[in-house]
From Swiss-Prot:
InterPro entries: Vps55/LEPROT. Interacts with RAB13. It comes from Mus musculus. It comes from the Eukaryota. This is Leptin receptor overlapping transcript-like 1. The keyword Transmembrane applies.
Amino acid sequence: MAGIKALISLSFGGAIGLMFLMLGCALPIYNQYWPLFVLFFYILSPIPYCIARRLVDDTDAMSNACKELAIFLTTGIVVSAFGLPVVFARAHLIEWGACALVLTGNTVIFATILGFFLVFGSNDDFSWQQW
């Protein structure tokens, strides 16, 4: 039952984060859809860590370096997702209010992604690795 509650709360967090992103795009005072490019970063962010978890053993000495590289790449993707709206706002493609809404959505979405890996990342029967 705890897994179901975690799944519901993670889906609620994802919906709230996407709501902030869409508010930053679709409100009539902003009306620019450039911030939707951060969706690519949402999709790309878990990929390096998922690949590293699949390819290496925990007993291998190389596994630590591979996981650290995956975490480094994931960090670069997350920092890019936070930097892109700021670059758009500095280039006057979007308003600063839209930038704030997108950054709030980024925080919620990446916290949701982190929560997913913390809840479902163990090697038990209720693991995301079986999906």
